[in-house]
Amino acid sequence: MATTGPLLSLAAGVMPDFSPQQTVAAAAESGWPAVGVWYDPATWTSATTIEMRDRIADAGLIALDIEVIWLKPGPDDPAHFAAIDAGASIGARNVLVVSSEPEPERTAEKLQRLSDHAAAAEMRVCLEFAAFTTVGNLQSALSILDQSGCEAVGLLIDPLHLARTGGTPADLAAIDASRCPYAQFCDAPAHGPPPSDVAAIIHEALDLRLMPGAGQLPLTELLAVLPRDVPLSVELRSAALRDTYSDPTERARALLAATQQWFAPA
């Protein structure tokens, strides 16, 4: 069991059935020090930005990240830059990016432009890899980061995605600590769906994650190779958690208690 105490953030993905405003309220009421924010370009307005900025500030919360920018083939999407602008206004430290762009060099170029846009607000653009994206593993993500030529672009590690793409904590040992401004955190069984079953992999990622300590992922080993006390976005996407705790504050409180228990000294 780990003994350190990093900054813990309630990930937006824990609350897919609630608005960003409700997620912030739940985080504040249940004692989380930080929160993640879901950005939906179809519903987010300038009024949303002002309201979220004020809610986060009034609650004394840290906005660890805003998500998600999903890169796709074609020209740059203005909504991606708008997401960064919204994140900057609410004080978000990082913006989460995934990619379905088939050409790695195009992903790298888009990341560079997004990172340049975020730099003025001292935000980090962080690339997350997953089996169901075109950045399918750690090695692909690192290659794209190198191609971007931008040291400010970060790497986001999700323990579930690392395990399901064949990675291990040892694979992270040689990565420059500055590449990882934060990480995600959850548990899961040691073995998941077969790599060929993409639908099942997505289902596990969205609905079957486990509380820290309830699975067999090498979480202690993972934290040992990540930067010391790296902030953690607790990404507990779980249908069981949602069904058990329909109230957002109760859900947030239960997840925080379980996560803190994992970090408590033995």
Annotate each PLM feature.
Residues M1-A12, P16-G31, A57, A86, ...:
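Histidine-acidic metal/acid-base catalytic patches
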Residues A47, P75-P78, A108, G166-T168, ...:
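Short, solvent-exposed loop/turn segments at secondary-structure boundaries
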Residues A57-V68:
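Short, structured active-site "lid" loops
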Residues G36-A57:
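Glycine-rich, proline-tolerant flexible connector loops at the mouths of alpha/beta enzymes
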Residues G36, D65, L96, C126, ...:
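Conserved beta-strand positions in the central sheet of alpha/beta enzyme cores
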Residues V14-P16, P41-T43, I69-K72, S100-E103, ...:
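Active-site-proximal loop/turn and secondary-structure-junction residues that shape catalytic pockets
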Residues E67-K72, R209-G213:
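The substrate-binding groove and active-site-proximal loops of carbohydrate-active enzymes
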Residues Q21, L71-L155, R164:
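Active-site acidic/histidine proton-transfer and metal-coordination neighborhood
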